[in-house]
């Protein structure tokens, strides 16, 4: 029964294949089945020509294949050695075929064939993918890794030379592939699109930017012989005064340079009393010395334009004043200034000095060589008219009888304490203990020399007897308050008269008052006593009449009236106890040079009461306000005694 065997064999094979294909997916999903996970057929493959169906159902198999021949002996022969390659169509075995073909291409020759040798099949570079194509002949499809396909190579020597034409790359389905590869050596302009141009942060940029390649240019060698390549020295550069003029050619006529070595002019005298002491200007000092140069100039007013570029000076000779050999050549530039000569009709350039080293110091800021001409006169601004200068007499014009009086002065080391309160009266200060006599001079218009000499015993007697007449004091008051003032148009004669008047007053007071202890007047901060060894200061200036002179006269009168109207004065020390201190104060210089009062006290001292006469007669009683102020001053003096020098210090 051969048909039965064949049917059995067929049914067994079909059942095996059916059983294998039905359970292969579930076993593969679990992964832990004791059965075979890969559905491999155990039947001999020599007689099974039909490929297994993709679906495991037997009814879906293709029925065009003929059944196998009946062979009962081979149908049950299950050989363990079977081929792994299944008998399927090339479309289903593409992965296996790819593996075999790749292994074969490893030993192929590395040389790339020419373009004309490549395959020109029309279906090679098709736009559609392979899984969408439907061809009747599937064996004609070539995989990407086949041996006849161009593969990548690192050997660039095998590449052929391509023309430098900029033709676009040919599309697929073209027969010619000559210009397939583009030249990579030539630069090309690229159009880059800036994606940030649409953002609001960059509203001004254009969307397209043209990037150009730099043109190839050889590196140029620097030409050191070019005239612009030479560095400019310091002497050729323009300084503070501008660029220097060109060097003078001795063949051409030049201008006469004014020398700055002339002696300085004498300073202008501020008062006519010092005109005799100053040297008279001579004709040589008025006209500056002129040093002759090479030749006279035909056009002295023309100067070269300093803004034009200087020409080359290699063919010219040396400058007019050659510098010393030790000077640096870069610092041989002369400064040119205009001299302020009153006799010159035009300005002429002149050199400061011939030595370039000294000239360099002047350019660098040397104090003695700043570059100013010698005929410049320094003039100080005049002082304000409100000041009262102190006129100190010259040493040669002081008379001899004034020396003993000044030698007996004692300014002591007692500072004058002042205490200004907030009370409304006119004068508020603390009266010090009366030191020795003092002589000083004040010059508002002319010369007003005042000397005070009061006897302490007479002052004590007048303080005890307030109703006693004071003829001597009245005489002195009259002589002090009615000093004759010279006219302002003759200051020199006024000075002589004032010095003679001061000499007479000092002689009369020396004879009448043997005791040297006299109260001096109050000295303001700008009034200093005339000491025998002091030098006269600068020459005082004549001032116009001002109300300050009237206030000074009022102050002097009030000082004398206060001595007359005060009924009680502080007790004066005995001559024996005060002799040693007065002798030391007369012989030794003062330790504290007479402290001046503050400005607020001066304003109170030199301010006159409105509505009062600035020149009151000696017999006229003082005003009521002034009497109250002096009485308050006396009470404050009695309440606060004067301390010694050690206590004050």
UniProtKB/Swiss-Prot annotation:
It comes from the Viruses. Residues 330-349 have a biased composition (Basic residues). Pfam families: Tymo_45kd_70kd. Residues 28-80, 257-286, 311-359, 458-550 are annotated as: Disordered. InterPro entries: 45/70kDa_tymovirus. Residues 524-533, 540-550 have a biased composition (Low complexity). Residues 268-279, 504-515 have a biased composition (Polar residues). Belongs to the tymoviridae protein p69 family. This is 70 kDa protein.
């Amino acid at each position: 029964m051969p048909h039965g065997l064949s049917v059995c064999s067929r049914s067994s094979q079909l059942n095996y294949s059916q059983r294998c294909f039905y359970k292969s997916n579930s076993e593969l999903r679990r992964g832990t089945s004791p059965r075979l996970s890969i559905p491999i057929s155990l039947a001999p493959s020599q007689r099974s020509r039909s490929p297994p169906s993709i679906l495991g159902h037997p009814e879906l198999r293709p029925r065009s294949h003929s059944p196998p021949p009946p062979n009962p002996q081979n149908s049950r022969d299950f050989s363990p050695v079977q081929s792994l390659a299944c008998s399927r169509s090339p479309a289903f075995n593409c992965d296996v075929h790819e593996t075999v073909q790749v292994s074969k291409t490893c030993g192929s020759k590395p040389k790339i064939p020419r373009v004309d040798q490549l395959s020109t099949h029309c279906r090679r570079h098709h736009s559609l993918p392979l899984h969408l194509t439907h061809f009747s002949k599937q064996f004609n499809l070539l995989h990407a890794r086949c041996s006849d396909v161009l593969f990548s190579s690192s050997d660039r020597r095998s590449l052929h030379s391509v023309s430098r034409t900029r033709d676009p790359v040919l599309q697929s389905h073209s027969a010619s592939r000559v210009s397939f590869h583009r030249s990579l050596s030539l630069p090309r302009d690229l159009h880059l699109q800036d994606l940030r141009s649409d953002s609001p942060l960059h509203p001004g940029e254009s969307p397209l930017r043209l990037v150009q390649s730099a043109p190839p240019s050889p590196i140029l060698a620097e030409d050191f012989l070019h005239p612009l390549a030479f560095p400019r020295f310091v002497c050729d550069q323009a300084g503070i005064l501008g660029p220097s003029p060109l060097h003078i050619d001795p063949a051409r006529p030049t201008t006469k340079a004014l020398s700055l070595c002339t002696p300085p002019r004498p300073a202008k005298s501020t008062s006519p009393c010092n005109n005799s002491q100053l040297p008279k200007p001579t004709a040589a000092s008025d006209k500056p010395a002129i040093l002759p140069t090479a030749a006279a100039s035909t056009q002295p007013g023309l100067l070269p334009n300093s803004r034009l570029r200087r020409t080359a000076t290699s063919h010219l000779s040396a400058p007019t004043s050659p510098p010393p050999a030790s000077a640096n050549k870069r610092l041989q530039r002369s400064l040119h200034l205009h001299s302020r000569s009153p006799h010159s009709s035009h300005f002429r350039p002149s050199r400061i000095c011939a030595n370039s080293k000294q000239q360099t110091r002047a350019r660098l800021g040397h104090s003695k060589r700043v570059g100013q001409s010698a005929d410049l006169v320094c003039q100080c601004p005049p002082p304000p008219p409100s000041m009262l200068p102190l006129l100190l007499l010259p040493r040669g014009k002081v008379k001899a009888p004034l020396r003993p009086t000044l030698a007996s002065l004692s300014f002591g080391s007692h500072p004058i304490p002042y205490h200004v309160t907030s009370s409304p009266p006119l004068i508020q200060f603390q009266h010090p203990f009366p030191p020795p006599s003092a002589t000083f001079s004040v010059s508002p218009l002319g010369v007003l020399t005042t000397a005070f000499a009061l006897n302490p015993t007479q002052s004590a007697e007048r303080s005890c007897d307030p109703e006693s007449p004071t003829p001597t004091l009245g005489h002195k008051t009259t002589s002090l308050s009615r000093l004759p003032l010279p006219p302002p148009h003759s200051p020199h004669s006024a000075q002589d008269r004032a010095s003679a008047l001061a000499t007479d007053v000092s002689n009369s007071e020396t004879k009448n008052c043997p005791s040297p202890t006299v109260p001096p007047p109050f000295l303001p901060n700008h009034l200093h006593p005339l000491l025998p060894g002091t030098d006269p200061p600068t020459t005082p200036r004549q001032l116009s009449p001002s109300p300050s002179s009237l206030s000074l006269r009022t102050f002097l009168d009030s000082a004398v009236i206060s001595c007359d109207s005060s009924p009680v004065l502080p007790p004066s020390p005995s001559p024996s106890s005060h002799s040693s201190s007065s002798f030391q104060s007369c012989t030794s210089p003062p330790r504290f040079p007479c402290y001046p009062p503050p400005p607020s006290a001066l304003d109170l001292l030199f301010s006159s009461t409105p509505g009062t006469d600035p020149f009151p007669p000696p017999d006229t009683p003082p005003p009521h306000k002034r009497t109250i102020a002096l009485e308050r001053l006396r009470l404050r003096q009695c309440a606060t005694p004067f301390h010694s020098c050690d206590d004050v210090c």
